[in-house]
Amino acid sequence: MKTHKALAYFLLLQLHGSLLAEQKERSPNIVILMADDLGYNDLSAYGHPKIKTPVLDQLAREGVKLTSFYAGATVCTPSRMALLTGAYPARLGWSKGVIGHIMKKGQGLSPDALTMPEIFKAAGYRTAMFGKWHLGDEPPLRPHQQGFETTFYLNKSNNQTKELWRDDEV
Protein backbone atom coordinates (compact mmCIF):
# COMPACT_ATOMS: atom_id res chain seq x y z
CA MET A 1 0.00 0.00 0.00
CA LYS A 2 2.86 2.38 0.87
CA THR A 3 4.44 1.60 -2.49
CA HIS A 4 1.26 2.61 -4.33
CA LYS A 5 1.02 5.88 -2.38
CA ALA A 6 4.68 6.64 -3.01
CA LEU A 7 4.27 5.86 -6.71
CA ALA A 8 1.12 8.02 -6.95
CA TYR A 9 2.93 10.86 -5.15
CA PHE A 10 5.92 10.54 -7.48
CA LEU A 11 3.66 10.60 -10.56
CA LEU A 12 1.81 13.62 -9.21
CA LEU A 13 5.11 15.47 -8.72
CA GLN A 14 6.17 14.56 -12.27
CA LEU A 15 2.87 15.82 -13.67
CA HIS A 16 3.14 19.04 -11.66
CA GLY A 17 6.71 19.57 -12.88
CA SER A 18 5.75 19.03 -16.51
CA LEU A 19 2.85 21.48 -16.16
CA LEU A 20 5.21 24.10 -14.71
CA ALA A 21 7.66 23.51 -17.56
CA GLU A 22 4.81 23.88 -20.08
CA GLN A 23 3.80 27.19 -18.49
CA LYS A 24 7.37 28.51 -18.75
CA GLU A 25 7.54 27.60 -22.45
CA ARG A 26 4.40 29.53 -23.39
CA SER A 27 4.96 32.70 -25.35
CA PRO A 28 3.84 35.94 -23.71
CA ASN A 29 0.68 37.71 -24.77
CA ILE A 30 1.46 40.78 -26.85
CA VAL A 31 -1.06 43.61 -27.06
CA ILE A 32 -0.21 46.71 -29.06
CA LEU A 33 -2.44 49.75 -28.62
CA MET A 34 -2.35 52.53 -31.19
CA ALA A 35 -4.47 55.65 -30.89
CA ASP A 36 -4.78 58.56 -33.28
CA ASP A 37 -3.99 61.96 -31.80
CA LEU A 38 -2.79 60.63 -28.44
CA GLY A 39 0.19 62.41 -26.96
CA TYR A 40 2.80 60.93 -24.62
CA ASN A 41 1.47 62.75 -21.55
CA ASP A 42 -2.24 62.15 -22.29
CA LEU A 43 -2.49 59.10 -20.00
CA SER A 44 -2.12 59.03 -16.24
CA ALA A 45 0.31 56.08 -16.57
CA TYR A 46 2.69 58.50 -18.28
CA GLY A 47 2.18 61.39 -15.89
CA HIS A 48 -0.98 63.30 -16.76
CA PRO A 49 -2.17 64.83 -13.47
CA LYS A 50 -5.90 65.04 -14.26
CA ILE A 51 -6.89 62.50 -16.92
CA LYS A 52 -7.55 59.14 -15.26
CA THR A 53 -6.98 55.99 -17.30
CA PRO A 54 -7.13 53.17 -14.72
CA VAL A 55 -7.35 50.23 -17.14
CA LEU A 56 -4.44 51.47 -19.24
CA ASP A 57 -2.54 52.22 -16.02
CA GLN A 58 -3.01 48.61 -14.94
CA LEU A 59 -1.76 47.35 -18.31
CA ALA A 60 1.29 49.58 -17.94
CA ARG A 61 1.98 48.31 -14.40
CA GLU A 62 1.58 44.63 -15.26
CA GLY A 63 3.19 44.68 -18.69
CA VAL A 64 6.02 46.44 -20.44
CA LYS A 65 5.80 50.21 -20.32
CA LEU A 66 7.55 51.79 -23.28
CA THR A 67 9.03 55.24 -22.69
CA SER A 68 10.87 56.05 -25.94
CA PHE A 69 8.56 56.72 -28.83
CA TYR A 70 9.23 57.10 -32.51
CA ALA A 71 6.50 57.57 -35.09
CA GLY A 72 6.88 56.71 -38.75
CA ALA A 73 4.56 59.58 -39.64
CA THR A 74 2.45 62.29 -38.06
CA VAL A 75 -0.87 61.12 -39.53
CA CYS A 76 -2.86 57.91 -39.25
CA THR A 77 -2.47 55.85 -42.45
CA PRO A 78 1.30 56.07 -42.94
CA SER A 79 1.86 55.80 -39.18
CA ARG A 80 -0.12 52.52 -39.11
CA MET A 81 1.88 51.25 -42.08
CA ALA A 82 5.13 52.01 -40.26
CA LEU A 83 3.95 50.26 -37.08
CA LEU A 84 2.75 47.14 -38.90
CA THR A 85 5.79 46.76 -41.17
CA GLY A 86 8.69 48.45 -39.40
CA ALA A 87 9.37 50.32 -42.65
CA TYR A 88 9.36 54.00 -43.41
CA PRO A 89 6.03 54.82 -45.10
CA ALA A 90 7.87 56.39 -48.05
CA ARG A 91 9.40 52.97 -48.79
CA LEU A 92 5.86 51.64 -49.01
CA GLY A 93 4.78 54.40 -51.39
CA TRP A 94 3.38 56.80 -48.77
CA SER A 95 5.00 60.15 -48.11
CA LYS A 96 1.96 61.98 -46.70
CA GLY A 97 -1.48 61.30 -45.29
CA VAL A 98 -4.51 60.21 -47.25
CA ILE A 99 -5.61 63.17 -49.38
CA GLY A 100 -9.11 64.17 -48.32
CA HIS A 101 -9.10 61.10 -46.06
CA ILE A 102 -10.57 58.92 -48.83
CA MET A 103 -8.34 56.34 -50.46
CA LYS A 104 -8.40 55.72 -54.16
CA LYS A 105 -9.36 52.29 -55.48
CA GLY A 106 -6.48 49.88 -54.95
CA GLN A 107 -4.64 52.26 -52.63
CA GLY A 108 -3.39 51.00 -49.27
CA LEU A 109 -0.81 48.83 -47.56
CA SER A 110 0.82 46.68 -50.21
CA PRO A 111 0.04 42.96 -49.89
CA ASP A 112 3.73 42.39 -50.66
CA ALA A 113 4.80 44.15 -47.45
CA LEU A 114 5.71 41.78 -44.62
CA THR A 115 3.66 42.73 -41.55
CA MET A 116 4.09 42.17 -37.84
CA PRO A 117 0.93 40.02 -37.62
CA GLU A 118 2.26 37.77 -40.40
CA ILE A 119 5.49 37.29 -38.44
CA PHE A 120 3.62 36.60 -35.18
CA LYS A 121 1.28 34.17 -36.94
CA ALA A 122 4.27 32.26 -38.37
CA ALA A 123 5.64 32.02 -34.80
CA GLY A 124 2.42 30.38 -33.59
CA TYR A 125 0.61 33.41 -32.22
CA ARG A 126 -3.06 34.12 -32.84
CA THR A 127 -3.55 37.58 -34.29
CA ALA A 128 -6.43 40.05 -34.03
CA MET A 129 -7.13 43.66 -34.94
CA PHE A 130 -9.87 45.86 -33.51
CA GLY A 131 -10.56 49.50 -34.40
CA LYS A 132 -9.76 51.71 -37.37
CA TRP A 133 -7.99 50.02 -40.32
CA HIS A 134 -7.77 52.75 -43.00
CA LEU A 135 -5.09 50.83 -44.93
CA GLY A 136 -7.17 49.70 -47.90
CA ASP A 137 -10.82 48.97 -48.59
CA GLU A 138 -10.78 45.98 -50.90
CA PRO A 139 -9.04 42.63 -51.17
CA PRO A 140 -6.09 42.09 -51.02
CA LEU A 141 -5.66 45.15 -48.80
CA ARG A 142 -7.92 44.17 -45.90
CA PRO A 143 -6.63 43.00 -42.51
CA HIS A 144 -7.18 39.29 -43.23
CA GLN A 145 -4.78 39.47 -46.15
CA GLN A 146 -2.25 41.28 -43.95
CA GLY A 147 -1.94 38.58 -41.27
CA PHE A 148 -4.87 39.21 -38.92
CA GLU A 149 -7.06 36.18 -38.16
CA THR A 150 -9.81 37.91 -36.18
CA THR A 151 -11.00 41.44 -36.90
CA PHE A 152 -13.64 43.97 -35.91
CA TYR A 153 -12.97 47.29 -37.57
CA LEU A 154 -13.96 50.41 -39.47
CA ASN A 155 -12.43 50.41 -42.94
CA LYS A 156 -12.04 54.21 -42.88
CA SER A 157 -12.32 57.07 -40.42
CA ASN A 158 -15.71 57.09 -38.72
CA ASN A 159 -16.59 60.42 -40.35
CA GLN A 160 -16.56 58.58 -43.73
CA THR A 161 -18.32 55.34 -42.88
CA LYS A 162 -20.32 53.74 -40.10
CA GLU A 163 -19.93 50.23 -41.53
CA LEU A 164 -18.39 47.86 -39.03
CA TRP A 165 -16.56 44.89 -40.47
CA ARG A 166 -16.20 41.61 -38.59
CA ASP A 167 -13.86 39.03 -40.06
CA ASP A 168 -14.01 40.52 -43.57
CA GLU A 169 -17.81 40.93 -43.69
CA VAL A 170 -19.98 44.02 -43.11
What are these regions (language model features)?
Residues M1-A8:
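Bacterial N-terminal signal peptides that target proteins for export
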